């Protein structure tokens, strides 16, 4: 027997039968936190929905609009660049239908 006569066979299963559809809405804590100048924000949309994520300063003034559009159900992650802002505490708020959640983050320069 020679090595040229060797045959290998394998069955590979690569069928995905269902898509992942989250059932809840969720806004995760940004990371890193504190940050300089960028941070990531992860959020989950439970059903197809118009989604808004905005950033506010400590006085409640809107300083950035990160998302303002219809989103299909799924898990998302975005990057926030705070390089144009001063050091301090900021809040980011997710609104999707009747769901609202706010988290705090800190920019340190």
What is each PLM-predicted segment?
Residues 67-98, 102:
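Short, surface-exposed loop/turn motifs with a glycine/proline- and acidic-biased composition
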Residues 17-31, 35-55, 65, 77-80:
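Glycine-centered coil/turn sites that cap beta-strands in beta-rich domains
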Residues 9, 104-109:
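Short beta-strand edge segments in extracellular beta-sheet folds
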Residues 34-36, 96-98, 109:
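A generic beta-sheet turn/junction motif
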Residues 1-11:
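Extracellular carbohydrate recognition
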């Amino acid at each position: 027997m020679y090595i040229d006569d060797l045959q290998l066979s394998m069955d590979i299963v690569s069928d995905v039968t269902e898509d992942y559809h989250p059932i809840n809405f969720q806004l995760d804590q940004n990371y890193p936190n504190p940050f300089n100048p960028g941070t990531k924000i992860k959020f989950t949309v439970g059903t197809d929905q118009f989604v808004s994520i905005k950033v506010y300063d400590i006085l409640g003034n809107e300083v950035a609009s990160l998302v303002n559009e219809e989103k299909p159900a799924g898990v998302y992650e975005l990057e926030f660049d705070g390089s144009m802002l001063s050091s301090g505490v900021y809040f980011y708020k997710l609104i999707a239908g009747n769901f609202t959640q706010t988290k705090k983050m800190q920019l340190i320069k």
